[in-house]
């Protein structure tokens, strides 16, 4: 291979690239063409007057990755051919084919809209690009102003980025599913947390404010507030030398809470 990789890493890279291709609804020829364009653009850059070699280390590393990607694409073509021979489809392929079908044939959406007049989409921050295109083609783009589509989601809880999910789909929802007349769909916030005390919410707000600037730029997320009945919380910060040490501390902490409650004749927190 163009870069040194263990066989297990090659398999992981292949599956990851293949999943991203399905999620973004592109085939190997499209990726290969873009990959070649990037290589040619880099090779065509003017060289430094006193450069000792044609490419800097960073440029050579980039080219090696491009060549490696080409090699992965060849393997993906073979992998997909084998899948077809065996009559298999994975979830990513099914989703990409469904999205392509809904885009290319408007009658599919017409049929679905005739059956479903109210559409509720939960955990929308965990949808991928192909899912977004699929749902938009079926129920969005202002094709039926009398149709009701509602999405619920929290971009701060997006946990499936590794499989292609994008919290920015929430931001796109407003224009993918516009209100009557073409205006952006309205947004309503559920700002009361019924499961967390205020101290935990304050800490979470500080944490996400520093780590999620890209998401916050795309989707404005107000801070949550505790319910009036929320109790106070104790926040502990610990560093452990191993995972086993962490497990032991957590188990002992809960053991102490239960033992104390038992001695006092009360229910544990």
Where are each of the predicted segments found?
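A general structural signal marking secondary-structure boundaries and capping sites
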Residues: 25, 105, 142, 177, ...
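Helicase P-loop NTPase motor core
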Residues: 181-187, 191-269
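Short acidic (Asp/Glu) and glycine-rich catalytic loops that position anionic groups and cofactors
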Residues: 55, 149-154, 180-184, 231
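Phosphate/oxyanion-binding loops and surfaces in catalytic or ligand/nucleic-acid-binding neighborhoods
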Residues: 14-24, 28, 41, 45, ...
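Short, well-ordered amphipathic alpha-helices
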Residues: 135-139, 170-175, 249-262
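Conserved helicase NTPase motor core
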Residues: 18, 48, 57, 61-172, ...
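Short helix-terminating capping/connector loops at secondary-structure junctions
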Residues: 4-5, 111-114, 143-146, 181-185, ...
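Coupling/switch/interface segments within P-loop NTPase motor domains and analogous charged loops
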Residues: 1-81
């Amino acid at each position: 291979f163009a870069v040194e990789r263990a066989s297990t890493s090659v398999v992981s890279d292949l599956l990851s690239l293949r999943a991203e291709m399905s999620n973004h609804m592109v085939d190997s020829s499209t990726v290969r063409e873009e990959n070649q364009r990037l290589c040619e653009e880099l090779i065509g850059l003017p060289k430094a007057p006193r450069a000792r070699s044609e490419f800097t280390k960073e440029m050579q590393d980039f080219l090696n990755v491009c060549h490696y990607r080409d090699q992965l694409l060849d393997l993906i073509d073979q992998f997909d051919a084998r899948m077809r021979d065996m009559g298999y489809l994975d979830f990513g392929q099914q989703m990409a084919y469904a999205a392509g079908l809904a885009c290319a044939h408007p009658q599919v959406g017409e049929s679905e809209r005739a059956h479903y007049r109210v559409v509720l989409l939960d955990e929308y921050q965990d949808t991928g690009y192909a899912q977004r295109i699929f749902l938009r083609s079926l129920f969005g783009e202002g094709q039926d102003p009398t149709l009701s589509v509602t999405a619920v989601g929290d971009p701060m809880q997006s946990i499936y980025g590794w499989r292609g999910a994008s919290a920015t789909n929430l931001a796109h929802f407003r224009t993918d599913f516009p209100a009557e007349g073409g205006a952006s769909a309205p947004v309503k916030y559920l700002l009361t947390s019924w499961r967390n005390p205020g101290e935990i919410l304050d800490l979470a707000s500080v944490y996400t404010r520093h780590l999620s600037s890209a998401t916050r730029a795309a989707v404005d997320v107000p801070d949550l507030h505790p319910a009036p009945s929320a109790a106070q919380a104790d926040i502990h910060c610990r560093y452990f030398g191993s995972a086993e040490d962490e497990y032991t501390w957590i188990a002992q902490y809960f053991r102490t809470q239960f033992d104390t409650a038992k001695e006092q004749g009360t229910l544990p927190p």
